[in-house]
């Protein structure tokens, strides 16, 4: 195993989720030398395994007022700085005949106290503005919920950090902390792509590894007791609702239906798991049954809608001994300066919170870093737009009128005002790779050159290749070939990554493999194993 020379910086950030990316951006904007390390790819943990809900905070207004206030504040900020990552759909909190209608008044009052707009509307009006909603509802409250693409949001933060000098090291796993007495002064990492090991040095190390933060802290003989609460979700094969639909009750299983991009999602469950199971993301048959049964109460059309796939994530909550479900644990932010808490200088942990509050978490963590380094520059991330969100989509679209509307519309939707810099009338930009999501070869090239793509799975998270109805059946082989063409992979690596990609898609289909989903999977297997010649031993489960 080779060892590379060490690198030095002002701060090392462990974790490539939204929070880690936000910290990298904030630190870089304040003039710090930044290195971020992530063992897999960006947004592969809890960041990429949630609803993608742009919380208004209403969901937490009754049970967690502090989190509710944080959510509505960040909701308004993200609508300004990340406009190409969010969709302000608005949301409905509905009361069904089996629910307590008197809770609605409590809910509205709690929202108002948290600064959240909450308007009670007539059930008939709710049915008009959201045809998918259960027509049996007896009450409805309109709130400023929305949706956010977590992959796009994380990638935009990473891109801005890189453009301000940050070094982003994906596929680099932390194998230990470097200490000098009672001070952490760096990390040891292993590059999964090359097998090389390396020492990285900095006066401050930030642990932003989410639920895996407990494991990172153990390298310093510290204990952060996390509460692993698994949440599972289902993806519909098309977008069945235009508003976020919530149950107007205290948070419970399967009580949010979220429209996102071309699909809708129903979730979540909440199940306490052992810490040694946090990398096991399998969705059980029981969870699927709960999600379907409860989801149909929100939108009866779900009963006739094909389920595309299932997935789950683990919430990075700080543990409480008296709550077996995790529902009553605060979603609030936890910032630990280990110099004050444990007498270990140079080490900070940021955890808790949620995707919605990633920017605020990053601000808190960066403030702590700057205090240690004597940096007095203020945070500007609440005011500076992310790359892609400098101008409205309508303005950008007028700059790329020469291409067919579906192609330019999808490109601008995903990349915002960065699109005109790479979109052209050339053959690459008219060559479709993924019909479901209207991804062109030109967009693949842009992602490879600018968005830190090392594999086919990385490309999926940057462009939505393989995330549509066919689940990679028609586009995965094209995308794999393009990665070789653009010098990301060799031919052998492309074949290996194609197998890995299809198996990852199958993991999400397997829990709901009946009817159309099973037939589609069998056809995919026939296409790649029979027609394209991928051998059984290469394809594992498929």
Curated annotation (Swiss-Prot):
Its EC number is 1.1.5.3. It holds the Pfam family Fer2_BFD. It comes from the Bacteria. FAD binds at residues 10-38. GO terms for cellular component: cytosol; glycerol-3-phosphate dehydrogenase (FAD) complex; plasma membrane. Its cofactor is FAD; FMN. Signal peptide: none annotated. GO terms for molecular function: flavin adenine dinucleotide binding; FMN binding; glycerol-3-phosphate dehydrogenase (quinone) activity. Keywords: Cell inner membrane, Cell membrane, FAD, Flavoprotein, Membrane, Oxidoreductase. It catalyses: a quinone + sn-glycerol 3-phosphate = dihydroxyacetone phosphate + a quinol. It is found in: Cell inner membrane. Its main location: membrane. Pathway: Polyol metabolism; glycerol degradation via glycerol kinase pathway; glycerone phosphate from sn-glycerol 3-phosphate (anaerobic route): step 1/1. PROSITE patterns: FAD_G3PDH_1 (PS00977), FAD_G3PDH_2 (PS00978). InterPro entries: BFD-like_2Fe2S-bd_dom, BFD-like_2Fe2S-bd_dom_sf, FAD-dep_OxRdtase, FAD/NAD-bd_sf, G3P_DH_FAD-dep, G3P_DH_GlpA_su. It is an enzyme of class 1 (oxidoreductase). It is a peripheral membrane protein. Composed of a catalytic GlpA/B dimer and of membrane bound GlpC. Conversion of glycerol 3-phosphate to dihydroxyacetone. Uses fumarate or nitrate as electron acceptor. This is Anaerobic glycerol-3-phosphate dehydrogenase subunit A. The lineage of its organism: Bacteria, Pseudomonadati, Pseudomonadota, Gammaproteobacteria, Enterobacterales.
């Amino acid at each position: 195993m080779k060892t590379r020379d060490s690198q030095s910086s002002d701060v090392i950030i462990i974790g490539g989720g939204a929070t880690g990316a936000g910290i990298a951006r904030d630190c870089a904007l304040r003039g710090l030398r930044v290195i971020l390390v992530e063992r897999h790819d960006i947004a592969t943990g809890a960041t990429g395994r949630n609803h993608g809900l742009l919380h208004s905070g209403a969901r937490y207004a009754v049970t967690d007022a502090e989190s509710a206030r944080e959510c509505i504040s960040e909701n308004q900020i993200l609508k300004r700085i990340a406009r190409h990552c969010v969709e302000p759909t608005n949301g409905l909190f509905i009361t069904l005949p089996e629910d307590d209608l008197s809770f609605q008044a409590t809910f509205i009052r709690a929202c108002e106290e948290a600064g959240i707009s909450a308007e009670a509307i007539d059930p008939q009006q709710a049915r008009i503005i959201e045809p998918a909603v259960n027509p049996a509802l007896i009450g409805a409250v309109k709130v400023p919920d929305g949706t956010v693409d977590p992959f796009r949001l994380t990638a935009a933060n990473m891109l801005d950090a890189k453009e301000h000098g940050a070094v982003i090291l994906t596929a680099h796993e932390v194998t230990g902390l470097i200490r000098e007495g009672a001070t952490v002064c760096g990390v040891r990492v292993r590059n999964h792509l090359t097998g090389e090991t390396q020492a990285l040095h900095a006066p401050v190390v930030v642990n932003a590894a989410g639920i895996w933060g407990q494991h990172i802290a153990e390298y310093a003989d510290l204990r952060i007791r996390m509460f692993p609460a698994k949440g599972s979700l289902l993806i519909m094969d098309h977008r069945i609702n235009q508003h976020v639909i919530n149950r107007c009750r205290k948070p419970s299983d399967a009580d949010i239906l979220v429209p996102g991009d071309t699909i809708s999602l129903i979730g979540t469950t909440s199940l306490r798991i052992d810490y040694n199971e946090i990398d096991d993301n399998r969705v059980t048959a029981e969870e699927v049954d709960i999600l379907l049964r409860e989801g149909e109460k929100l939108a009866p059309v779900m009963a006739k809608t094909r389920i595309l796939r299932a997935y789950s994530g683990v919430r990075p909550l700080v543990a409480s001994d008296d709550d077996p479900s995790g529902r009553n644990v605060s979603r609030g932010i936890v910032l630990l300066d280990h110099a004050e808490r444990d007498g270990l200088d140079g080490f900070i942990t940021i955890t808790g919170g949620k995707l919605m509050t990633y920017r605020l978490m990053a601000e808190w963590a960066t403030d702590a870093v700057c205090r240690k380094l004597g940096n007095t520059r203020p945070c500007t991330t609440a005011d500076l737009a992310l790359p892609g969100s400098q101008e409205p989509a309508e303005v950008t679209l007028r700059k790329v009128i020469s291409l067919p509307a579906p192609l330019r519309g999808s490109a601008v939707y995903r990349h915002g005002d960065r699109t005109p810099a790479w979109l052209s009338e050339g053959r690459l930009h008219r060559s479709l790779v993924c019909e479901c999501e209207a991804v062109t070869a030109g967009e693949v090239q842009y992602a490879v050159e600018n968005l830190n793509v090392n594999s086919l799975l990385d490309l999926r998270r940057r462009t939505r290749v393989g995330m549509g109805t066919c689940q990679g059946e028609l586009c995965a082989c094209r995308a794999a070939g393009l990665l070789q063409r653009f010098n990301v992979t060799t031919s052998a690596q492309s074949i290996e990554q194609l197998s890995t990609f299809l198996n990852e898609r199958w993991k999400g289909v397997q829990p709901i493999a009946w009817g159309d989903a099973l037939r589609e999977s069998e056809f995919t297997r026939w296409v790649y194993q029979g027609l394209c010649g991928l051998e059984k031993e290469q394809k594992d489960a498929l």
